[in-house]
Regions:
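Bacterial Sec-dependent N-terminal signal peptides
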Residues: 1-29
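Glycan-recognition and catalytic cores of secretory/periplasmic carbohydrate-active enzymes
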Residues: 25-407
Length: 407
């Protein structure tokens, strides 16, 4: 959608009115500085990863490095994905080599049908690698991962199953066919596979999943449930709950932004206006929520009982910023200012680690799952990934605008 003259005029007025604020056009030097710091800090992390031959995930409660799990870990694609973005920015071959090296460690996971996070794992690693290099071996691996992922699709439900419920903590919740809002993020790989292969089967699954999720996951105020459980035979909704939020009816911060990012993706590939409208509604809900602090970095749950004395979630903020940058390119509304404000605050000393600190992760103060007493107020590899992605999106956008002015 082309931006209206009204939006363009509004942005100009906004830039004049806020000329002293961080939400004005981001100087290219500032973006360079932030990306250069990300490269320096992640270089230190890379040294540790190479020495251990493991993929960094987070830091434990007692201050030790926590590597991704053996077997399968939904976060294992983010570190090589960050390396791909840093290769795109620096053109330094060490990042390409690092990304290739670490994604190779989980290549066989593309054939594991027990996990729904194959899109997270493989799109963020091999998908970025294929986008940047065009390596056909990466394309083959992505196709395998996509074929495995769609085996979890139930036509009666119309969705891809999230967790299996025959073991672990998931077996204790009484679920039959749980679908989590996070699963919207796995659709990007499917849409991309239809684009690069010409086979609509991937896109058909993605569209069905997005449509059913749009129908059942969102409350009248556009906030999202975390988990919707379905009857696998009839396709009917059994219950709506949470796993990582404060309560079943609360608004888990990262869940809201998974939905924002997911429907922005859906619009990118389909140009179906209902997805754009949904993304805009979620964005407006997040931006205008009364629980969002002035620095725009949310508490881990908008309804957490001890606000303002609750942990922030920098990962949710980074995901939001990245999604808003893309959404701004499709919408008549101005979402870029909010994205820049979030990134400016994430880049402050309150959230951005000092060089060599924070176990060499970039961002501090993220939350994995408070109900599971896991990864609370720690760095997370996906917070770094989406922060760097957001910076790269802004960097590429600014370069595009500067080139258009020259032409």
């Amino acid at each position: 959608m082309k931006r209206s003259l009204f939006k363009s005029f509004g942005i100009i007025l906004g830039m004049i009115a806020f000329s002293a604020c961080s939400i004005k056009q981001t100087p290219q030097s500032t973006l360079n500085d932030r990306l250069n710091f990300a490269s320096v800090q992640t270089s230190l992390l890379l040294k540790k990863a190479m020495a251990s031959q493991k993929i960094p995930r987070t830091v434990t409660e007692d201050g030790h490095m926590h590597w991704t799990r053996e077997g399968f870990d939904w976060t294992e694609g983010f570190f090589p994905g960050t390396c791909w973005y840093l290769y795109e920015f620096t053109k330094d071959s060490k990042w390409k080599e690092a990304a290739s090296h670490f994604q190779k460690k989980f290549e066989d996971h593309r054939l594991m049908p027990l996990y729904h996070d194959l899109g997270f794992v493989f799109h963020c690693s091999y998908g970025q690698g294929y986008r940047i290099t065009g390596n056909n071996e990466y394309k083959k691996i992505l196709i395998d991962a996509g074929n495995t992922l769609i085996t979890r699709f139930n036509p009666k439900v119309g969705c891809i199953r999230s967790w299996d419920v025959d073991k672990g903590w998931q077996s204790k919740r009484g679920w039959e066919f749980p679908v989590i809002i996070d699963n919207m993020m796995n659709l990007e790989m499917l849409f991309e596979l239809s684009k690069i292969t010409g086979d609509k089967k991937y896109e058909d699954v993605a569209i069905s999943h997005a449509d059913v999720t749009l129908k059942n996951h969102f409350r009248p105020d556009i906030s999202s449930y975390h988990v919707v459980d379905y009857d696998s035979i009839t396709g009917e909704v059994r219950n709506k709950q949470t796993a990582q939020g404060y309560a079943h009816e609360s608004e888990w911060a990262r869940g809201q932004t998974w939905g924002l990012y997911g429907y922005t993706i859906c619009y990118r590939y389909t140009k179906d206006i209902k997805y754009l409208k949904q993304a805009e509604k979620i964005a407006d809900f997040i931006i205008n929520h009364p629980s969002i602090p002035s620095d725009r970095i949310p508490y881990w749950d908008y309804d957490a009982p001890k606000i303002p004395n609750e942990p922030r979630d920098a990962s949710a903020a980074a995901i939001t910023a990245s999604a808003l940058i893309e959404l701004d390119g499709y919408s008549d509304k101005d979402y870029l200012s909010e994205a820049k404000l979030i990134l400016s605050n994430l880049s402050s000393a309150k959230y951005l680690a000092a060089e060599g600190e924070n176990h060499n992760f970039i961002l501090m103060h993220s939350v994995g799952s408070i109900p599971h007493n896991n990864e609370i107020d720690v760095p997370l590899n996906y917070a770094d990934y989406y922060y760097v992605e957001a910076l790269m999106r802004l960097y590429n956008l600014d370069n595009k605008e500067q080139n258009s002015l020259k032409n």
